[in-house]
Amino acid sequence: EINNIKWEVDMSIPNSKDFFENTIEDFDSIVLFSHVKPDGDAYGSSMGLKLALQGLFPEKKCYCVGSYDEPMPENFEKPIKPGELSIDIIKNSLCIITDTGTKARIEDPRALEGKFIVKIDHHAPDDHFGDLEFVDEAKSSCSVIVADMLFASFPVIPANAASAILLGILSDTDGLKLALEADDFYKVGRLIYNGADFYKTYHSISSNSLKDIELNKAILNATKIEGKVIYTVFN
């Protein structure tokens, strides 16, 4: 029960409880990775899980590797750049790869050199890799799967983890406009009750930079209308 609201235990991700109780416990260090040209869901799922594990298992060393550099609230933690984390750490760690459908799309391929590899994803499972997979292509984002897994075992997660996961969900669902099911809203509610700041997070990913405005202007200026057809031509 959080803030006088009773939340149901989520068991929609099979074996996730065993993952936290056994797999995590076997390692002293954990490294999170995601895909090339990382978007908000790549950041939210990897950094969100890293921060959650860091708070829930304070005796373990947790790292997040990625080049995500899109707008986000100032207090959000930035990942370690690909190639900067010692290969010795990676080889002796549990490596978790999120939001990445194929091996070829892993941003830092050294992730596959980890001692034990876990894949968490919501894309069609065309390329199976790793020692353990949590894949549900019916989910709107990988960050929702991470939230599912965490809430199946922990009623409360760190606020900074909740905020990062929220960013991932909002990013992949265009601010919940593309949410696939009521569960997306339910998970967002739980994240907010765990300390995520909806307004700051939504504002950070929905604000347009001058570069974005200039690009939109160029697209609109190149738009043609013929009858009921609207199209854009770029030279």
In which residue ranges do the predicted regions lie?
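Short glycine/serine/threonine/alanine-rich loop segments
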Residues: 58-60, 115, 155
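Glycine-rich, phosphate-binding/catalytic loops in enzymes
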Residues: 49-50, 112-115, 135-136, 187
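Active-site cofactor/cluster-binding pocket
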Residues: 77-132
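Short beta-turn/strand-loop junction motif enriched in small, turn-promoting residues
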Residues: 37-38, 102-103, 151
